[in-house]
Amino acid sequence: MNPSQILENLKKELNENEYENYLSNLKFNEKQSKADLLVFNAPNELMAKFIQTKYGKKIAHFYEVQSGNKAIINIQAQSTKQSNKSTKIDIAHIQAQSTILNPSFTFESFVVGDSNKYAYGACKAIAHKDKLGKLYNPIFVYGPTGLGKTHLLQAVGNASLEMGKKVIYATSENFINDFTSNLKNGSLDKFHEKYRNCDVLLIDDVQFLGKTDKIQEEFFFIFNEIKNNDGQIIMTSDNPPNMLKGITERLKSRFAHGIIADITPPQLDTKIAIIRKKCEFNDINLSNDIINYIATSLGDNIREIEGIIISLNAYATILGQEITLELAKSVMKDHIKEKKENITIDDILSLVCKEFNIKPSDVKSNKKTQNIVTARRIVIYLARTLTALTMPQLANYFEMKDHTAISHNVKKITEMIENDTSLKAKIEELKNKILIKSQS
């Protein structure tokens, strides 16, 4: 089968805008291709990178199904200057809109769990259904750093670009610097044209707009004009609108006028799914015990977790050895130690007692009341998981006879967790609260 025909056949699998904007610009490079390597030329580096990331595997799979042969797909930038003139899509327009957008940040690569499904659902709905934009406008996504807010924001951007929409993505810092630069150059008209004449405006870390009243005034008018023109606005922040410091009341009111969706730290099963997805994307193979170790040993910052995965792969590649659990522990030991130094057993005891509405002195006593025993075991379990305290040190803290009593409590609570999903969820929630507090 002619590889060029593969792209034509793929047209049936994609929407018209998606095909016309991207795959229709590819040209099969017969000279550089081989039996097991198919090379396609894209108009420029930006397009090549985007298409390789988003469609490379899909093209390879489609080729195998249609021809019965396997081949690696390589999308590269066409070297001739003439290529930019022949493309059906305005490349300069795309670069101006989406240079900052990460093509790997898509809805397909986002791992959905209980902690983020509302935010995910809202963003995906407006990205694919224009009518919902009028109802869900603006969308305000908030939560701690590193949990996927930027991923969702850029997923909306990438999906909107595929539909031929004009997208502007900017962090608050980008927005402020853009305004300041145009103000100094006497070119505010250029600034206004850029931000007001878009279909979709994506603002990351909107909480940092509160630096000056002038910046907020500019954003207020831009916000109103986009919304009045039926444009879509999505923002992210670390806190909900009513808790934003330095932001004017009229802006807070605008932010809260649509959907407010929070993203919370993921539960263990979602963390494991995220790690698997990151491994798949980076083509890294990790065993289940290593994945579980990473998930239970690190906090919930997804960028941090991905950094560890890439570091593990780098160590293994450079040293020429397999990624083992021992290697993982060695690579992660300083990182885990740093985390644990920020968490004390007193912090854990205080939070657990507050959750169970009991006194710390009761937990540290010999009382055998069921809720006190359970709380005590949870404190011990979390202390073993989140701190560097040894069993003898914990035995001393609880004034127990020796460390075997601590070991017994750890064994009991572990069995309880395995058989009680609600208890497992509660402990995971407590763990996340402690980790968030330690990082603040």
Swiss-Prot record:
Residue spans making up a coiled coil are none
Please provide an example of a Pfam family that matches this protein in its UniProt record: Bac_DnaA
Q: Which SMART domains does this entry report, sorted A to Z?
A: AAA (SM00382), Bac_DnaA_C (SM00760)
Domain I, interacts with DnaA modulators: annotated span: 1-74
* CDD domains found in the cross-reference section: AAA (cd00009), Bac_DnaA_C (cd06571)
Signal peptide (from-to)? none
According to UniProt, the name of this protein is Chromosomal replication initiator protein DnaA
Task: Look up and give the organism this protein is from.
Answer: Campylobacter jejuni subsp. doylei (strain ATCC BAA-1458 / RM4099 / 269.97)
Q: What is this protein's gene name?
A: dnaA
